[in-house]
Amino acid sequence: MIDLREDTWTLQLYAQRYKGLSPKNSRELQLRMEYDPLKPNLPTSGEEQNSKPEWLNTPPCLIPESESLDKAKGALVGLAIGDAIGTTLEFLPRDKLHVNDMVGGGPFRLQPGEWTDDTSMALCLAESYISAGRLDITLFREKLVRWYRHGENSSNGRCFDIGNTTRNALEQYLKHGASWFGNTEPETAGNAAIIRQAPTSIFRRKSLQRTFADSDSQSMATHCAPESMASCQFLGFILNYLINGSSREKAFSPHVMPLPVRVLLINAGEYKEKKRDEIRSSGYVIDTLEAAMWAVWNTDNFHDAILLAANLGDDADSVAATTGQIAGALYGYSNIPKPWLDKLVQQERISNLAEQLFYMAPEEDF
C-alpha cells in the first residue's frame, strides 16, 4: 500500500505494478477520448464503432428492471441521505463528535433532513438531463447559477453552502460565457463534481462509454482538473456496474481504463487493506473517493456505510454523500432505513427524479 499524498513521481513508480490496468494507447482510443463537452461527437457507426475497446463494453443488466430501478433510486436518494447525515459533522476534526442518526445542526444549523450543496448540484444535473434529454452543459450551468443566486434546488430556499472552486466557475461562466472551461490546476481538484455524479450514471445506465463521456463533461462544468474528471469517470463506472446488478466484489474489482495515477491506485483496490487512520476525509477529490470506497467495502449495509463515512469528519457531508451514491446503488432504495427516508427533505421529489432519469435512459447507440 502507498499513501496517495505521496508525490506524483513516487506514485508513478509504485503504480508500475498495476500497469495492466491501463489500456493500450491507440489512435482509435485517442479519438474516443477527444470530445467537446459543448458538442459531444462520439462515434455512432461504421469502422469507428467497431474500434470500441473491450473495457468500454457496457455490462449486461443482470437483474429485473424493477430491481435496477430500486438501485438507481437508491443512488440519488442515498446521495441526499449521506449529505443530510454528514452535514452535522462538516468541518469538524475527526472524532470530536459522532453521529448515529439524521439530526441536523452542523455549521449551517440545519433542520434534520435538510441537505447541502452536494444534493442541490445533483438535482440541477438531474433536471438538466430531464429537460434536454441529454447532458446540456450550458443548461446545467444555468441551473447551477439559479441555485447559487436564488436558492433554487436547495433544501431551505437559500444557497448557504458553495465551494470556492464552484463559485469561481459560475462567476467565470457569467463573465465569459459558455466557452469558459477553467479550474484546471491540481489545487482545484475538489470533490464538488463527484458528489453530484449519480444522475449521470442513472441516465447513462445503458452505455458505459456515454457514462464515461458525460461524467467527464459534467465535471468540466465547474472542475476541469484531471483528477476531478477522472474521479467522476471512475465513480461513473462503479455506479453503472451496481445499477446493472453487479455484486460489490465485481464492481469493486480493478477495471481497465485510462486514469491518472492516484485514481488508478484507488481502482487497483489498495484502500481495501487500509485502516481508518490511513483514510482521509478532506474535500480533495482523491481523499473523498477513497474514503467512500473504503466505507462501502468495510460494511455490509447502507446504514453502517453512511455512519462509517460521516464519522470520519472533516468534509463529512461530501464523503457521506459519495458513499450514499455507492451504497444506495449497491443495496437499493428499499434498503435505506425508513426513518431516514421519512426525515429527508423532498425525499419523494428526489426519488421521482431518479425514476424519470431511469426510464429516460437512451439505448446504447454506438
UniProtKB/Swiss-Prot annotation:
Pfam families: ADP_ribosyl_GH. Keywords: Hydrolase, Magnesium, Metal-binding. Residues 1-65 are annotated as: N-terminal extension. The keyword Repeat does not apply. It catalyses: N(omega)-(ADP-D-ribosyl)-L-arginyl-[protein] + H2O = ADP-D-ribose + L-arginyl-[protein]. Its EC number is 3.2.2.19. Residues 74-366 are annotated as: ADP-ribosyl hydrolase domain. It comes from the Bacteria. Its cofactor is Mg(2+). Changing residue 32 to E: Partially protects E.coli against cognate toxin Tre1. No longer protects E.coli. Binds 1 Mg(2+) ion per subunit. The N-terminal extension forms a projection that reaches into the active site of cognate toxin Tre1-Sp where it occludes the active site. Belongs to the ADP-ribosylglycohydrolase family. Forms a stable complex with cognate effector protein Tre1-Sp. This is ADP-ribosylarginine hydrolase Tri1. It comes from Serratia proteamaculans (strain 568). The lineage of its organism: Bacteria, Pseudomonadati, Pseudomonadota, Gammaproteobacteria, Enterobacterales. The gene is tri1.
